């Protein structure tokens, strides 16, 4: 029943060493070798403060509200070989102690916010998930019938959007991260006088402005339905397996297809993990990907199979309202004296809204 909770900044790194010295009751990991919680048989619970905060130690120190501390730099030589018998100097011990104090101060602020260490969520995404869940399932009014009705409507909607295991696996094959690939013409070189554009809260903005699949996937019989017509229908979204033959990039700096997302490949010339040219490949994509691929590549032949369609609609109103509330708090509380905690919380939660939607199960 009793637990001793210990926070470790980047638990997945430290765990590979410390796992040998404890007997474990249970370990919760988000990926292979990425535990975020580990409990020993005698009740010691290790949690990951890096996953909770989303910040490096240096950035974490900068974002503390009621504590003033900075991460020390340059006082620890990582090139030296050390073992369990190595004595650390006062300067080195000070460096190590400072890192621990940053995490300690952060957790103290979290306890103040949540009232109890056991109430602190495991991840930053967990905070926003609970916030959005409450918006979707409960009414702001004190009337019980309002909350019951809202809860039932949202539950019914989620049932309408549920997936089979095969459909979920296929959607995972479609999923890609952001396109941040460097041009092979300039990779490794230092460029002067460059320009850039930053879209403020770009991911949440797109979640508000665009339509998303709001139905179960429906298998398409391409003998009866025109793929081209479906592709041009803004009320329909598609996912499908796509075989491409004779693939050639139209230019040298926009290689969209990721080599790791392709299978049954032949004659691939890769540009740092991206397909520059291929005799043949198969991949699983959406209609959005397909339009981008057509814009980036010259392709001799395209064969579409295993096609599913979704009916597109804007995200449920409670989710949109939750995003808008977080954005409002982020913008109106910035720089307001006495609202530092609320500002940083809203900023962190807003940045985690997209991550909440693409968390693997």
Regions found by a protein language model. Give the residues of each.
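Conserved acidic
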Residues: 2-10, 15-361
């Amino acid at each position: 029943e009793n637990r001793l909770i210990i926070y470790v900044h980047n638990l997945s790194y430290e765990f590979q060493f410390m796992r040998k010295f404890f007997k474990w009751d249970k370990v919760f990991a988000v990926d292979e070798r990425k535990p975020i919680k580990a409990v020993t048989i005698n009740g010691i619970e290790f949690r990951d403060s890096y996953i909770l905060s989303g910040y490096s130690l240096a950035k974490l120190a900068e974002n503390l509200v009621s504590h003033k501390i900075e991460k020390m730099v340059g006082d620890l030589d990582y090139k030296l070989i050390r073992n369990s018998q190595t004595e650390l100097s006062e300067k080195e011990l000070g460096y190590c102690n400072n890192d621990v104090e940053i995490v300690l101060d952060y957790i103290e602020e979290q306890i103040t916010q949540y009232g109890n260490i056991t109430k602190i969520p495991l991840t930053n995404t967990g905070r926003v998930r609970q916030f959005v869940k409450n918006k979707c399932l409960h009414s702001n009014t004190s009337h019980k019938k309002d909350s019951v009705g809202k809860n039932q409507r949202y539950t019914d909607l989620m049932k309408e959007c549920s997936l089979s295991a095969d459909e979920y696996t296929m959607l995972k094959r479609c999923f890609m991260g952001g396109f941040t690939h460097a041009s092979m013409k300039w990779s490794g070189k230092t460029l002067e006088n460059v320009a850039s554009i930053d879209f403020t809260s770009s991911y949440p903005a797109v979640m508000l402005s665009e339509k998303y699949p709001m139905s179960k996937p429906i298998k398409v019989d391409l003998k009866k339905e025109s793929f081209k017509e479906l592709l041009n229908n803004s009320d329909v979204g598609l996912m499908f397996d796509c075989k491409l033959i004779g693939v050639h990039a139209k230019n040298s700096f926009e290689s969209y297809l990721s080599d790791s997302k392709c299978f049954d490949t032949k004659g691939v010339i890769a540009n740092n993990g991206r397909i520059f040219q291929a005799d043949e490949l198969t991949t699983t994509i959406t209609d959005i990907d397909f339009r981008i691929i057509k814009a980036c590549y010259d392709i001799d032949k395209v064969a579409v199979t295993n096609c599913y369609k979704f009916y597109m609609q804007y995200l449920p109103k409670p989710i949109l309202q939750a995003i808008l509330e977080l954005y409002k708090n982020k913008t109106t509380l910035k720089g307001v004296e006495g609202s530092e905690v609320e500002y940083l919380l809203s900023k962190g939660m807003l940045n985690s809204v997209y991550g909440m939607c693409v968390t693997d199960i």
